[in-house]
Amino acid sequence: MAYSEKVIDHYENPRNVGKLDEADDSVGTGMVGAPACGDVMRLQIRVGEDGIIEDAKFKTYGCGSAIASSSLLTEWVKGKNLDEAAAIKNTEIAQELSLPPVKIHCSVLAEDAIKAAVKNYRDKKGA
């Protein structure tokens, strides 16, 4: 299976790897996993007073496609509001990275992670 140059780039040079303080009220955390393939993804967002995502971090244990999907997603969500971020579809990620059909589940994981992070943030804020 051949990976696209974008997958290889995000895998070899992942963007926004790290962790934000989960106790911070401005941080939403999404933790998702796919036991079938062993991929686990933690994605976090920091939201400003204006409701715009200021920062995003991830840590992914999994294959190159899972790492690339979460790396790309952290780039995409910065500067977006919560609704825009939660509206990102796995198909957009898969298309951007040219993921092969057997790796589509990695983009689904990334979509689930951003939705979970947005929900966690909103739950903290009581919104």
Language-model-detected regions and their locations in the chain:
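Immediate flanking context of iron-sulfur cluster ligation sites
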Residues: 51-61
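Short, thiol/selenol-centered motifs that function as redox-active sites or metal-ligating centers
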Residues: 37, 60-69, 106
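Alpha-helical support elements that line or immediately flank enzyme active sites
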Residues: 65-80
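Short beta-strand elements
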Residues: 39-49
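Short Gly/Pro-enriched turn/cap motifs at secondary-structure boundaries
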Residues: 31-36
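C-terminal binding/interaction regions
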Residues: 1-22, 28-30, 48, 54, ...
